[in-house]
């Protein structure tokens, strides 16, 4: 049972099943919808079963490994595995994609292609989180881009082609740096190309080479996360994409950058990370405030939510650079939490647009009375986004805050400045979120009154209520009992901060699990 290729099946099943969509009889869209939803649900249930029965939550290292030689001449293997860092993101991918497929029910134009692209995107994202080969990692990184571009360019707003072109230019540009970094690190040394991540993580590199490779990876991940100033594609993309696509972008795609940064830049290139981490922490703190201020100025609902995503990703940078397992665990939890919250906010923004036919906040108002279900669930998601105690966002941001404070690597002055800037961002967050809720659901203006009078507005359907409640339940569950998810990656976070990669490397890190500072070295 343990030797069964579960991860390969989980990865390839969606796209393989998607190839059968053209064979479905042309009897309307319902059959195609149910088929795509069934594929997503089966894959999600399968990964839940496999991880629940085969994964050792207290084990170390990569588990459920599969290694199949693919192209021998360049040592390219289908090499996949899962550990505490990737398991949560794989489960998040299955969960969000299943709900996004259900959210795409209103799509009627070319549904065969639409659902195939969603299933192809699903496989690409799963493959990236499970890849243990650098070239396979890059292959999945690129595979995921094609469906996203087509989903953006064919379904969305009037400026969807502009948004799709901007997205592909940014991400393709980042991919050039990603490929260059992969080739540099894999070809270094006398033993030929080495693409196995586990082998590469145990090697030592000259500091200059490590810095160069670190920067190459960082640029690629900075586009995807996104990090200022590589973030400008995100508001345009979210502003034009169909809301089911927005759920996939906010819920999963942004996490690919954070995952790659932790997996490669921190775990494999620890010496370079020690040099750049303070700058990234400062950049993350500045990004929180900058994106919050820009979000306040946005008049478009989806663009305001998009800039809130940029702001929240600043916390991921701070946690990843905190040099503490508490901060690193908080960064991972922030990615999971934002995946749920972002998907919920964009879904509700999209369903509100379907009813009001506007995304301009100044044209809204008074939607609370005719849309009580939408009002209550949107408010709940906004509360989770502003880190209300009892919601997942609060736990993640608190862990990151305490992680940077507990770090012994940084000076008290540096930590004081960062925490003060974080505090400013935390104060600004309710301003743009609560004002957004107020403009949408409270008060009236001439335009909103005319819309309310001229149209019969129905509240959220049972399908829509099910989707948003499915997202709210884990937000509350994590908020009240964070160990529900933290146990998935706490062990891995401690490994990363306590065992720097490479031979004869020494890095002073603090682990919140230990009472005193430790200096860890590896000698082989």
UniProtKB/Swiss-Prot annotation:
One cellular component term from this protein's GO annotations in UniProt: chloroplast thylakoid membrane
Transmembrane segments: 4-24, 31-51, 87-107, 113-133, 134-154, 167-187, 211-231, 242-262, 275-295, 308-328, 330-350, 386-406, 417-437, 465-485
Its membrane topology: Multi-pass membrane protein
Known catalytic reactions: a plastoquinone + NADH + (n+1) H(+)(in) = a plastoquinol + NAD(+) + n H(+)(out); a plastoquinone + NADPH + (n+1) H(+)(in) = a plastoquinol + NADP(+) + n H(+)(out)
Pfam families registered for this protein in UniProt: Proton_antipo_M (PF00361)
Signal peptide: none
GO molecular function, one term: NADH dehydrogenase (ubiquinone) activity
Main location: plastid
GO process annotations (BP): ATP synthesis coupled electron transport; electron transport coupled proton transport
InterPro entries found in the cross-reference section: NADH_Q_OxRdtase_chain4 (IPR022997), NADH_Q_OxRdtase_chainM/4 (IPR010227), NADH_UbQ_OxRdtase (IPR003918), ND/Mrp_TM (IPR001750)
Enzyme nomenclature, EC number: 7.1.1.-
Alphabetical UniProt keywords: Chloroplast, Membrane, NAD, NADP, Plastid, Plastoquinone, Quinone, Thylakoid, Translocase, Transmembrane, Transmembrane helix
Top enzyme class: translocase
Domain of life where this protein originates: Eukaryota
Subcellular location: Plastid, Chloroplast thylakoid membrane
Protein family: Belongs to the complex I subunit 4 family.
HAMAP family per the UniProt record, alphabetical: NDH1_NuoM
Record protein name field: NAD(P)H-quinone oxidoreductase chain 4, chloroplastic
Protein species of origin: Staurastrum punctulatum
Record lineage: Eukaryota, Viridiplantae, Streptophyta, Zygnematophyceae, Zygnematophycidae
């Amino acid at each position: 049972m343990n030797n069964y290729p579960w991860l390969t099946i989980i990865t390839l099943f969606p796209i393989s099943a998607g190839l059968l969509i053209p064979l479905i009889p042309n009897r309307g869209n319902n059959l195609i919808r149910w088929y795509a939803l069934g594929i997503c649900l089966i894959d999600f249930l399968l990964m839940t079963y496999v991880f629940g029965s085969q994964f050792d939550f207290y084990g170390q290292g990569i588990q459920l490994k599969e290694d199949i030689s693919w192209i021998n001449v360049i040592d390219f293997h289908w090499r996949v595995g899962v550990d505490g860092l990737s398991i949560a993101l794989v489960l998040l991918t299955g969960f969000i994609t299943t709900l996004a497929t259900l959210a795409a029910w209103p799509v009627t134009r070319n549904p065969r292609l639409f659902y195939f692209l969603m299933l192809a995107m699903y496989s690409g994202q799963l493959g990236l989180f499970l890849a243990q080969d650098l070239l396979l990692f890059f292959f999945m990184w690129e595979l995921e881009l094609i469906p996203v571009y087509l989903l953006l360019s064919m379904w969305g707003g009037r400026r969807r082609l502009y948004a799709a072109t901007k997205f592909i230019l940014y991400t393709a540009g980042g991919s050039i740096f990603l490929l260059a970094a992969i080739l540099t690190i894999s070809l270094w040394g006398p033993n030929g190309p080495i693409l196995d991540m586990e082998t590469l993580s145990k090697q030592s590199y000259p500091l200059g080479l490590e810095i160069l490779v670190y920067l190459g990876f960082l640029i690629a991940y900075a586009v995807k996360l996104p990090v200022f100033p590589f973030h400008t594609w995100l508001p345009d993309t979210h502003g034009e994409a169909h809301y089911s696509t927005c759920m996939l972008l906010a819920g999963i795609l942004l996490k690919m950058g954070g995952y790659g940064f932790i997996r490669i830049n921190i775990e494999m290139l620890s010496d370079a990370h020690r040099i750049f981490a303070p700058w990234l922490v400062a950049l993350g703190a500045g990004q929180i405030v900058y994106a919050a201020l820009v979000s306040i100025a946005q008049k478009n609902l989806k663009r305001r939510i998009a800039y809130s995503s940029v702001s929240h990703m600043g916390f991921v940078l701070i946690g990843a650079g905190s040099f503490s397992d508490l901060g690193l665990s908080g960064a991972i939890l922030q990615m999971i939490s934002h995946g749920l919250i972002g998907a919920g906010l964009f879904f509700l923004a999209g369903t509100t647009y379907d009813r009001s036919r506007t995304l301009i906040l100044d044209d809204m108002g008074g939607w609370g009375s005719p849309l009580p279900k939408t009002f209550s669930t949107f408010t709940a998601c906004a509360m989770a986004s502003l880190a209300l105690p009892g919601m997942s966002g609060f736990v993640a941001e608190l862990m990151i805050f305490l992680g940077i404070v507990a770090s012994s690597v940084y000076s008290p002055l540096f930590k004081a400045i960062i925490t003060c800037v974080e505090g400013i961002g935390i104060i600004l967050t309710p301003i743009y979120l609560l004002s957004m809720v107020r403009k949408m659901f409270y008060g009236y203006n001439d335009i909103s009154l005319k819309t309310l009078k001229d149209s019969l507005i129905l509240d959220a359907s049972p399908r829509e209520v099910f989707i948003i409640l499915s997202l709210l339940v884990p937000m509350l569950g994590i908020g009240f009992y964070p160990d529900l998810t933290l146990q998935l990656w706490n062990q891995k976070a401690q490994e990363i901060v306590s065992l720097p990669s490479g031979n004869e490397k020494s890095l002073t890190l603090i682990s919140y699990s230990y009472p005193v500072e430790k200096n860890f070295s590896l000698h082989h």
